[in-house]
From Swiss-Prot:
Location of this chain's protein in the cell: Host cytoplasm; Host nucleus
Name of the protein: Early 3 14.7 kDa protein
InterPro entries: Adeno_E3-15
Gene Ontology terms: biological process: symbiont-mediated perturbation of host defense response; symbiont-mediated suppression of host apoptosis; symbiont-mediated suppression of host NF-kappaB cascade
Pfam family, one: Adeno_E3_15_3
Amino acid sequence: MTESLDLELDGINTEQRLLERRKAASERERLKQEVEDMVNLHQCKRGIFCVVKQAKLTYEKTTTGNRLSYKLPTQRQKLVLMVGEKPITVTQHSAETEGCLHFPYQGPEDLCTLIKTMCGIRDLIPFN
């Protein structure tokens, strides 16, 4: 018997595990699509500079609530200021930022609430 397949003689337990894995994978895919749809529908005054649009988001439903995890990529900004006739170049780097929002309740609008919170998070928590 191969260890990677976890096959059993009767096959019933193996079949049950495979069905559970398929169901879990299907649910993860559905949640991933739901997040993509919410991100595409999200509109605010920040436009493409909104954290919701810039971050890589993953959404999980658990027995203790819902979690929206985010990962913001490294960013580099460059600004040239003129002082008299001499240019001053300012370069700023921000490190990769990751975190998550945990919503301990279950409801039909949980993802929407988490997306709105994520949108306003830049005002609450300073990102570089």
